[in-house]
């Protein structure tokens, strides 16, 4: 199994798709990397030679921030926003959407499952 920057690439997938399993590499970066190294995007990950793996590894490490480094940077950015108390930091702290999405309805993935609140009691008949 081919390993790049600590990630096992799926053997049966085309390289264009397999490279997107690396955090920080999407379709565009995958295609840029393959073009720069001269490897066909249609090639399967299982067919990579050791030389091609080294080329891919060197190109990705030299040009992009990926995996652990990128995760640490994103976490540090969020932590900084929370510490300075800016609007985005407050939204992160409260677990609400940060980028202006509506919250009256929806936003369930950010807010978590609904928590039922007791309603107002109706007075009984006599």
From Swiss-Prot:
Residues 95-126 are annotated as: Disordered. GO terms for cellular component: cytosol; small ribosomal subunit. One of its GO terms (molecular function) is structural constituent of ribosome. SUPFAM superfamilies: S13-like H2TH domain. The keyword tRNA-binding applies. One of its GO terms (biological process) is translation. It comes from the Bacteria. Keywords: Ribonucleoprotein, Ribosomal protein, RNA-binding, rRNA-binding, tRNA-binding. Located at the top of the head of the 30S subunit, it contacts several helices of the 16S rRNA. In the 70S ribosome it contacts the 23S rRNA (bridge B1a) and protein L5 of the 50S subunit (bridge B1b), connecting the 2 subunits; these bridges are implicated in subunit movement. Contacts the tRNAs in the A and P-sites. Belongs to the universal ribosomal protein uS13 family. Part of the 30S ribosomal subunit. Forms a loose heterodimer with protein S19. Forms two bridges to the 50S subunit in the 70S ribosome. This is Small ribosomal subunit protein uS13. It comes from Salinispora arenicola (strain CNS-205). The gene is rpsM.
């Amino acid at each position: 199994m081919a390993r790049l920057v600590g990630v096992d690439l799926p053997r049966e997938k085309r390289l264009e798709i397999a490279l997107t399993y690396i955090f920080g590499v999407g379709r565009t970066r995958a295609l840029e990397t393959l073009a720069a190294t001269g490897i066909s995007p249609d090639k399967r990950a299982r067919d990579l030679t050791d030389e091609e793996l080294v080329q891919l590894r060197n190109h990705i490490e030299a040009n992009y921030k990926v995996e652990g480094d990128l995760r640490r940077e994103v976490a540090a950015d969020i932590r900084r926003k929370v510490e300075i108390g800016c609007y985005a930091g407050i939204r992160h702290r409260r677990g609400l959407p940060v980028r202006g999405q509506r919250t009256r309805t929806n936003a369930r993935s950010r807010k978590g499952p609904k928590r039922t609140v007791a309603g107002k009691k109706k007075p009984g008949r006599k």
